[in-house]
């Protein structure tokens, strides 16, 4: 482990020893949890100056494949290649929520306001609600990603050939299908629920205007964008898959016929952006790069500021704390970095 760096904001570096699959803070922002490809979840203070050693919990006998904060604000959910969805409480005890009949659980999301959890296993999604557990699907292909609408009334699923939108309060009703050729690999609702965005295997983004069903395609990406983020106000859509921070504007009439805002990261050699994460309350986007660099893009000021340099391994997970002052970045090699951006004086 390493302590605070000599320059820049307070930071901490911890070696977890395995691919960082996902990161999540508890609702207070005091605790950070990191799930790894070794099937373990590490818990540590989000404050990089704390210095406490991580506390490990075994969640799966194989790998953790998906991770998020749970319903209580102090618990976390992990899906694994053992087909189990596991809840880890504040007491660091792991309990099984469900076991998929076949395959592994490689997608999980939670909506605290509706007390709902959705977990993807193959072509099926298991929707856990206060009224019981419902099996949604099968979908046209294995589920690549899923997300709740901001109010939790809908669950959107990405798969080959487009997306499927389920009504969470009426899971037995026929879902809405939005079709577009190719494999859709990431999916996010805009904060105002007006748009649904996906990234595709064909190195493009696709966006539907949900009221009318009209859609638009954004092409020209260097590779497939595995990470999508909307700014807190829904005015910008940002993704990985390119060397620039490409921001598509959705204020007013949207981006049709308009070029995106492109922000150039500093440095002489272009490096692919692998992960993005939007600030919870300001027009900032955290950028993780293929060489391990971490930057912050300020869309309002149209600039990108480096936070930390290369580690030699791609950034695989990014996370802001709920108040937006602390952040964390994990890499494929298992390096976890914590930062504190609070003003010092």
Regions from the PLM with identified roles:
Residues 1-345:
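WD40-repeat beta-propeller superdomains and closely related acidic/aromatic-rich repeat-like regions
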């Amino acid at each position: 482990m390493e302590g605070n760096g000599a320059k820049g904001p307070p930071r901490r570096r911890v070696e977890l020893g395995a691919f960082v699959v996902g990161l999540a803070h508890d609702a207070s922002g005091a605790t950070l949890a990191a799930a790894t490809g070794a099937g373990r979840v590490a818990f540590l203070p989000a404050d990089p100056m704390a210095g406490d050693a991580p506390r490990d919990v075994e969640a799966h006998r194989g790998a953790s494949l998906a991770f998020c904060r749970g319903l209580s604000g102090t618990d976390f959910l992990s899906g694994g290649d053992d087909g189990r969805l596991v809840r880890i409480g504040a007491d660091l005890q792991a309990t099984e929520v469900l076991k998929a009949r076949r395959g592994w659980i490689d997608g999980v999301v939670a909506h605290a306001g509706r007390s709902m959890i959705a977990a993807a296993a193959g072509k099926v999604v298991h929707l856990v609600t206060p009224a019981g557990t419902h099996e949604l699907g099968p979908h046209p292909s294995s589920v690549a990603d899923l997300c709740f609408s901001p109010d939790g009334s809908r669950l959107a699923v990405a798969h080959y050939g487009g997306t499927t939108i389920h009504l969470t309060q009426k899971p037995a009703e026929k879902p809405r299908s939005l079709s577009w050729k190719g494999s859709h690999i990431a999916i996010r609702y805009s904060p105002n629920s007006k748009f649904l965005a996906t990234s595709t295997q064909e190195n493009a983004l696709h966006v539907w205007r949900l009221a009318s069903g009209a859609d638009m395609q954004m092409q020209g990406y260097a590779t497939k964008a595995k990470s999508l983020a909307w700014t807190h106000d829904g005015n910008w859509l940002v993704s990985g898959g390119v060397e620039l921070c490409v921001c598509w504007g959705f204020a007013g009439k949207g981006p049709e016929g308009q070029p995106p805002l492109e922000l150039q990261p500093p440095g002489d050699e272009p490096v692919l952006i692998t992960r993005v994460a939007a600030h919870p309350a300001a027009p900032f986007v955290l950028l993780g790069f293929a060489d391990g660099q971490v930057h912050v893009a300020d869309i309002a000021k149209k600039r990108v500021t480096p936070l930390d340099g290369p580690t030699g391994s791609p950034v695989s997970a990014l996370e802001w704390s709920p108040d937006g002052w602390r952040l964390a970045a994990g890499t494929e090699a298992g390096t976890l970095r914590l930062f504190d951006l609070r003003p010092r004086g």
